[in-house]
Amino acid sequence: MSQNKEAIHFLSRIANLPKGPVSLDAVLQPSLEDEAELRKLFATDKGNARLKDIHVGLVDVFAAPSDIRTTRARVITGDADRDSQHVMPLPDPQRRKEGSPAMVDNLEAFKKNWNIFTENSLSQLSDWSNVVAAGGSVQACLIPLPKAASASKRAMRKHYHERAFPSSDVDLFLYGLTPQEVRHAPFSYPHFSLTPLWKAEHKIITIYEAVRDSVPWDVICVRTKHTVSIHCE
């Protein structure tokens, strides 16, 4: 995707930061205000022209300069200041150093981490239209791996599933589809064909089947009012 106007402004503010530890408040505040405005538009004016851009409010981090993927350590004036902003502050050994990588370098590295983190459970999902992955699982795969954890796929699995994120799940969100609305797109199901009809529930079934066909374990799908949970070992 191409960077939108808001992303370009944000990247420019990052690029103009001086070297060394520095406060990011002035850089982040305009973006936080813009996000608040977008949230307001989504809630009160969904037909607004700004919302026609499906990437509004987003930054293509891998198409951006390396500044966006570089750690800018928080300015700390003393022990009290280090702990004052956090309920559970990270110990010093876990704090990223100034100038160290804040995320992986490219999309290929992210995909490698993603496949290990998800145990390839979404490898059979060939059509990602109207589906977006977000949340902690994505952030986990963006974070650079410790050297010891990147030695092998086995080491990566132990890092993700036993050390760093032992209870993490994968959050998928549907957009542009509701149970009542019909989207014109081809859909095939084992016992019948729905062409060109496609509803949100059919998309959910497709995701479930993709997970079921990708892992060697039993898969259970549980639907509640607002979510559908897919469980396996």
Predicted regions and their residues:
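Catalytic cores of the polymerase beta-like nucleotidyltransferase superfamily
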Residues: 1-233
